[in-house]
């Protein structure tokens, strides 16, 4: 114990481990110093608030209203979210009560025509989570009824995202598994006089459904009067390729007088002959529509609760009508509000435009809100599920600001990833009287289970350019000429004695310094990286891809709203040697689809760069070059939408 007490490195390590981040200045300071600063700011804020309240009262009195300003609400304490909360209460609890079942069966039925986005994460969490909570199972069913838009890469990516979020499908099925069964039921519909072959074009169909504004009387087309035998023959002719696409289609004979458009004789089968199906090849020339396929596949698979978003509320009527008409098992469809996010675009067409214009690197660009983009950025899967759970599930559409999503991610990372020291824009500092020393650093000041690692303090270190000023000021507490600042976990604070500049660029290239052994507790501490074991990395700082919350409303279209600072690259950043152990022990954390050591891609190597941001390794990294993506900042960026 005596040796430890005499060791300045040990004392400083113990002392600096208790430092806290001043979020306003980005400095690490002692608890006492932070308390003083916060008190000063609170006093200033209270003064400004009192003045504003006084002005408001004066204004109100002048208007004949002397009511005092309302008291501010107390800030609620942070509550740890129950990961099963959305199934225990509210909408999903009521859904289960409507049809309680010992054998809950749900399904997630995406179309394999694009990459999933953040909204699909809610659908995955709701359907798989509902089944899991009630001890049931969930199918992953590909709704592969449109060969013109389906590609193998989408099938693969969808399954990967489901598993990455921590869910295992009970079975992976395809609507195309049931093509023959669906066809047979379509013929049965004809024999029941509940379907007919129609030759009408778009203009005629619009007239039948009430015209341009829906003000005219609705009526059924003359083709509905054909006999069962005629319709059967013509439907078989469609199957045999005797019609070209759009020359004929099979319609359900529903109720054209019903006020619900989903009962206006919807299409059941259409002709598609230009592209082979990814699984059945050229076997079929006709394909069932979503409205015909979806409810029947739910029935075939014994789905108990068919959970979908509220744009399908009207479809519930046709869903139930078709199952009843055919006399098959009837699942229960219920609808919840979808998840949207402002400040970005989720449309496949618009994202494709961004890719084609090379505004982003691809569908997995970390600035996009595709799930593969969010994953590449380094957002942990469990954080996404926490976000969905925090929002809850109701019948209202949730349109959320990006900052709300990032708050959840930040809160999750704070307690689950290790801390390392890193500098984005390094300046060399030569400490003239320093000796090499070992410094032990905890990976987390709050979680001892994360362990610790040892780095080497060296006479030459690197600090961030943002932590040095050539001209000092009273309100600046970091390094400046003849000024002292603490280096996190270093033996002593340092004082800058001189600096050198590049004559061409005017940038500082080197700072000379000495230990300041007289100053026991500097007002601020900054991070540093030594020369031994450190690594050069490329750090990509991702900001919002768009300048506004509503890029679609921008004059000239969403492409005119691109933020020119959406990606800022630091090509020469440095990270300390503890990175090697963090990489070896990934994933951070072990949760959801990254539940075991070694599971997860490079993005599962996550950490907090002290005083900088949260980062993850990018998939562009190689053995010779490490590339990091900023996941989120340490605090909400000022001015962020």
Q: Which sequence ranges carry the predicted segments?
A:
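Long, charged, mostly alpha-helical binding arms that flank functional sites
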Residues: 331-408, 412
């Amino acid at each position: 114990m005596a040796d430890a007490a005499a060791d300045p490195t040990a004392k400083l390590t113990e002392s600096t481990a208790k430092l806290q981040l001043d979020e306003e200045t980005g400095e690490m300071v002692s608890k006492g110093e932070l308390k003083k600063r916060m008190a000063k700011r609170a006093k200033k804020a209270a003064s400004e608030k009192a003045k504003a309240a006084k002005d408001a009262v004066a204004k109100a009195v002048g208007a004949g209203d002397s009511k005092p300003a309302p008291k501010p609400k107390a800030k609620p304490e942070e509550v740890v979210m129950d990961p099963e909360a959305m199934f225990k209460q509210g909408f999903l609890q009521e859904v289960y009560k409507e049809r309680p079942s010992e054998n809950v069966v749900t399904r997630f039925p995406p179309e394999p025509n694009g990459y999933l986005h953040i909204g699909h994460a809610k659908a995955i969490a709701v359907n798989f989570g509902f089944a899991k909570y009630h001890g049931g199972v969930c199918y992953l069913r590909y709704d592969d009824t449109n060969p013109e838009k389906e590609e193998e890469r989408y099938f693969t990516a969808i399954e990967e995202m489901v598993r990455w979020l921590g869910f295992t499908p009970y079975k992976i099925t395809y609507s195309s598994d049931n093509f023959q069964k669906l066809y047979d039921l379509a013929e049965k519909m004809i024999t029941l006089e509940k379907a007919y072959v129609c030759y009408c074009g778009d203009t005629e169909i619009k007239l039948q459904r009430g015209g341009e504004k829906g003000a005219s009387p609705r009526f059924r087309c003359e083709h509905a009067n054909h006999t069962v035998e005629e319709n059967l023959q013509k439907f078989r002719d469609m199957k045999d390729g005797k019609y070209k696409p759009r020359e004929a289609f099979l319609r359900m004979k529903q109720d054209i007088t019903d006020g619900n458009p989903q009962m206006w004789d919807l299409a059941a089968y259409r002709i598609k002959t230009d592209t082979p199906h990814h699984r059945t090849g050229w076997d079929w020339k006709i394909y069932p529509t979503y409205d015909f396929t979806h409810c029947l596949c739910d029935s075939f698979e014994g789905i108990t609760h068919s959970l979908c978003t509220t744009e399908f509320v009207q479809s519930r009527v046709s869903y139930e009508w078709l199952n009843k008409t055919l006399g098959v098992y009837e699942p229960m469809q219920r609808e919840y509000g979808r998840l949207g996010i402002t400040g970005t675009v989720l449309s496949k067409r618009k994202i494709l435009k961004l890719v084609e214009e090379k505004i982003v690197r691809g569908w997995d660009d970390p600035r996009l809100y595709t799930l593969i983009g969010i994953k590449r950025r380094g957002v942990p899967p469990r954080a996404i599920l926490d976000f969905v759970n925090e929002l809850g599930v109701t019948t209202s559409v949730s349109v959320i600001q990006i900052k709300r999503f990032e708050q959840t991610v930040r809160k999750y990372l704070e307690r689950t990833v290790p801390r390392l020291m890193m500098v984005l824009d390094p300046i060399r500092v030569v400490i003239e009287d320093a000796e090499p020393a070992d410094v032990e650093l905890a990976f987390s000041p709050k979680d001892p289970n994360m362990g610790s690692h040892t780095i080497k303090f060296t006479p030459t270190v690197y600090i961030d350019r943002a932590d040095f000023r050539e001209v000092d000021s009273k309100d600046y507490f970091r390094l400046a000429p003849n000024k002292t600042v603490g280096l996190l976990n270093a033996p002593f604070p340092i004082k800058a004695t001189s600096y050198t500049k590049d004559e061409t660029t005017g940038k500082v290239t080197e700072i000379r310094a000495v230990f300041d052994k007289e100053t026991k507790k500097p007002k601020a501490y900054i991070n540093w990286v030594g020369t031994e074991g450190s690594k050069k990395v490329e750090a990509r700082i991702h900001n919002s891809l768009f300048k506004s919350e509503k890029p679609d409303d921008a004059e000239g279209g969403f492409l005119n709203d691109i933020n020119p600072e959406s990606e800022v690259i630091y090509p020469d950043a440095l990270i300390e040697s503890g990175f090697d152990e963090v990489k070896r022990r990934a994933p951070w954390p072990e949760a959801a689809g990254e539940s075991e050591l070694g599971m997860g891609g490079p993005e599962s190597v996550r950490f907090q760069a002290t005083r900088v941001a949260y980062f993850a390794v990018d998939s562009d990294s190689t053995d010779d070059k490490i590339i990091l993506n900023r996941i989120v900042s340490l605090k909400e960026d000022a001015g962020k939408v």
